[in-house]
Amino acid sequence: MPNPLPLVFDAPRRAKPPRHFADLDATARAAAVAELGLPAFRAKQLATQYYGRLTADPQQMTDLPAAVREQVAEALFPDLLTAVREIETDAGETRKVLWRAVDGTTFESVLMRYSDRNTVCISSQAGCGMACPFCATGQGGLQRNLSTAEILEQVRAAAVELRDRDGEGIAPAARGGRLSNIVFMGMGEPLANYNRVIAAVRRIVAPPPDGFGISARSVTVSTVGLAPAIRKLADERLNVTLALSLHAPDDELRDTLVPVNNRWKVSEALDAARYYADVTGRRVSIEYALIRDVNDQPWRADLLGKRLHGALGPLVHVNVIPLNPTPGSEWDASPKPAEREFVRRVRERGVSCTVRDTRGREIAAACGQLAAEG
């Protein structure tokens, strides 16, 4: 067991990234355009370009006069992120990008193409302060929160990649298409960067020209169980999918595997999840990384099924995740027979349960592997 790291909820104070158009809601966009002395209709033009046409370079916004392009480029469209490394696997169907921000901070996103959907896994923080010992991100500590624009730029870049992608050596499923799903399951605890994440979600789900127009049902916000923030998220009425990273049904083990459990116990996290389900009518996803001889015992499967059925009834689904290897970890995934028995026992308690498809393990792009190295 690695030496436990402290929980960190408040990101270290660092200089803020430069203001970007994507940081601004409709009211702030109108104010920013007015500050530049431009007519009000330019705000909608810019939003249509960014959210509707996925254009972040004003020089490509040919419906704007050249002088206006120069003006907004300097004031509203600074270069925020640089892709410093891109790695692919699965014949191009899984692609990990290492991003570097203007202050040198690094973080990662992962684009995954499936036959029926295209999903981008995005980061909400550089690093993570939740200190889960089986997660490479958590063991790296928290550098800082990402800005709303830094979050949204990951989404826009993925949408552009899908729209423009083609070429030899690329599987047919990896060619072209439209971004359909967003999961806040990259680096960081989304609910610890609450205001910026919520602002990003609002822009993701709003129809163009105010946002990317992704269905709220296709957006998943993950959390290790910040119970008050889960309730707050429910009250936003955004109706996104909530994914609770549980990983153990009992406090004794979860106190170690998910250190935030020392603040909010399993019962408190499940009560908050039930509140979310009641308010939104949405089924809650439970994430459970299955670790050999740690949390895969039959009695824990029974307890998990019992507690989830009691707390959430039919409004729950368990995603069992075979543990992905991380550097220096002494743990590994449960054997397949143990995995199958675990799933069977959870289902026996009346709870929907499946094993999640693991993508990107070979390029350290799978759940728990993102470390922004290099």
UniProtKB/Swiss-Prot annotation:
PROSITE patterns the record matches: RADICAL_SAM
UniProt KW S-adenosyl-L-methionine keyword: yes
Reactions accelerated catalytically: adenosine(2503) in 23S rRNA + 2 reduced [2Fe-2S]-[ferredoxin] + 2 S-adenosyl-L-methionine = 2-methyladenosine(2503) in 23S rRNA + 5'-deoxyadenosine + L-methionine + 2 oxidized [2Fe-2S]-[ferredoxin] + S-adenosyl-L-homocysteine; adenosine(37) in tRNA + 2 reduced [2Fe-2S]-[ferredoxin] + 2 S-adenosyl-L-methionine = 2-methyladenosine(37) in tRNA + 5'-deoxyadenosine + L-methionine + 2 oxidized [2Fe-2S]-[ferredoxin] + S-adenosyl-L-homocysteine
Catalytic residues (positions): E108 (proton acceptor), C367 (s-methylcysteine intermediate)
Cysteines paired by S-S bonds: C121-C367
Keyword rRNA processing carried by entry: yes
EC number: 2.1.1.192
UniProt cofactor note: Binds 1 [4Fe-4S] cluster. The cluster is coordinated with 3 cysteines and an exchangeable S-adenosyl-L-methionine.
UniProt similarity note: Belongs to the radical SAM superfamily. RlmN family.
Name of this chain's protein: Probable dual-specificity RNA methyltransferase RlmN
UniProt organism field: Mycobacterium sp. (strain KMS)
Lineage, top ranks: Bacteria, Bacillati, Actinomycetota, Actinomycetes, Mycobacteriales
